[in-house]
């Protein structure tokens, strides 16, 4: 509630990404919540534009961590796809001091998304003894950054040697960009391998598929959010996939935001939903490869939309798929699915899964 109040008061916050919802169960409450949430995101983007200037709007998404502080005048942006960390400020006084503080806190922040309120400018980032970015960033001497002393020295080096500035027409924007190590994606993935293996054994879902979904959904960003209010590493939506999984486990209601921001809980829930798609919603598809293509596409756009590509009758759709080769099923889903995002999604996840199978 506190986060939504902050959203409403400051006209509010960040989040941007896929608008696709996991699952096909569209209920009125979910639609109202999502529409209201989307309106607040639009208002927040407008407010950031007023503060930072035209074409300077940066908001959090599945693969982008964005945290504003200093009355929204300083921001930290981690692009987990590109592997860059950009710290910027439009503070009119002592901009270097604002940047230095933000650099240190970003480098040393922990990996508990529920402790950071992305919906306000509150400086609630705590320095951790186990920084989330440890090993994903090295300082100017090539050393990983764990302690405040090393982070402070690196911040001083960056401000002296890499400080940039540009004008947005009204203000000067000061910035520092840090490149992550080349294998930053693998470094993040490694953090969650134990959780992935546990979920894989529990639900009978291939580890490579879980990892491929995580890479495609969030680039292993535990802070991942979206305009459809999908949360965490596997971008689970509380009121659809989350509710389906809870119901299958004999639980009432929906998983909380803090539950889905917990990496282990998120991976467990996302994997449970993959198992439901495979064993229940799409269980009538006989060929395991064809069924895997259908499951991947359904994780993005829903099982119903997958089956309707082949027939409006679900049983007939499965029968039609069972007469096709896996290659033809893949070709059909990547060319005839009504959602361009879902068509691309199957290609991305399938490609990523191949890379994890080779390891």
From Swiss-Prot:
GO terms for biological process: cell wall macromolecule catabolic process; cell wall organization; peptidoglycan metabolic process. Residues 1-16 form the signal peptide. Keywords: Cell outer membrane, Cell wall biogenesis/degradation, Lipoprotein, Lyase, Membrane, Palmitate, Signal. InterPro entries: Lysozyme-like_dom_sf, Murein_transglycosylaseC, Murein_transglycosylaseC_N, Transglyc_AS, Transglycosylase_SLT_dom_1. Its main location: membrane. It is an enzyme of class 4 (lyase). A lipid is attached at residue 17 (N-palmitoyl cysteine). It is a lipid-anchor. GO terms for molecular function: hydrolase activity, acting on glycosyl bonds; peptidoglycan lytic transglycosylase activity. A lipid is attached at residue 17 (S-diacylglycerol cysteine). It is found in: Cell outer membrane. Belongs to the transglycosylase Slt family. Murein-degrading enzyme. May play a role in recycling of muropeptides during cell elongation and/or cell division. This is Membrane-bound lytic murein transglycosylase C. The lineage of its organism: Bacteria, Pseudomonadati, Pseudomonadota, Gammaproteobacteria, Enterobacterales. The gene is mltC.
